[in-house]
Structure formats: structure tokens, C-alpha cells
């Protein structure tokens, strides 16, 4: 009688999809104007999530916490105490 020697080797059968392999798009947060720079009213100064930087003089805060200039002037990033920062816009005085 013939003996048949069958051997089955380990093999990878089904290939599932991976759960990684995706990345979210960047939100472009951060400073949009530098300290000492001249800005016009309505210019965006800082895009943020939450209040990393607080609005100072002549600066408004939008619904998504974006800081914007209310008047034309010079941008100043300042400290409020030890651990808080604020951004202000100081109007330029025109000489006649």
C-alpha cells in the first residue's frame, strides 16, 4: 500500500484592513501677525482653540476664539502676570 505524506504549512489566508493609516489636516492655528507689526481693523491676529492668549486693548474675540484687531494700529503681545498672555493693538497717533 502507498503511504501519502501530506504536510500543510502555515500560510496567511485572509488579509483584513488596517485601522491606522490616516491623518487629519492641519488647522493652521497660531500667530498671524508679529509683535510691532502694523495692522488694519478686522485683521486676524491669532487663531487658537480656547483662550491660550487673551484679548487686550482694541482686540476682539470671535466665536472660535480667534483674536482680531478692532482698530488700525501696532500689535503688542504682552504678559498678564506670570502665566497669562494677551495681545493688544495700540492706535498710531497721526501728527497734523
Curated annotation (Swiss-Prot):
One of its GO terms (molecular function) is structural constituent of ribosome. The keyword Ribosomal protein applies. Pfam families: Ribosomal_L27 (PF01016). The N-terminus is cleaved by ribosomal processing cysteine protease Prp. Keywords: Ribonucleoprotein, Ribosomal protein. InterPro entries: Ribosomal_bL27, Ribosomal_bL27_CS. One of its GO terms (cellular component) is cytosolic large ribosomal subunit. NCBIfam families: L27. Belongs to the bacterial ribosomal protein bL27 family. This is Large ribosomal subunit protein bL27. It comes from Anoxybacillus flavithermus (strain DSM 21510 / WK1). The gene is rpmA.
Amino acid at each position: 500500500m502507498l503511504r501519502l505524506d501530506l504536510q500543510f504549512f502555515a500560510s496567511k489566508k485572509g488579509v483584513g484592513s488596517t485601522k491606522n493609516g490616516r491623518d487629519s489636516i492641519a488647522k493652521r492655528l497660531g500667530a498671524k501677525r508679529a509683535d510691532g507689526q502694523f495692522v488694519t481693523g478686522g485683521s486676524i491676529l491669532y487663531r487658537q482653540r480656547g483662550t491660550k492668549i487673551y484679548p487686550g486693548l482694541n482686540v476682539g474675540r470671535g466665536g472660535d476664539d480667534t483674536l482680531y484687531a478692532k482698530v488700525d494700529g501696532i500689535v503688542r503681545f504682552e504678559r498678564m502676570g506670570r502665566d497669562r498672555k494677551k495681545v493688544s493693538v495700540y492706535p498710531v497717533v497721526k501728527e497734523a
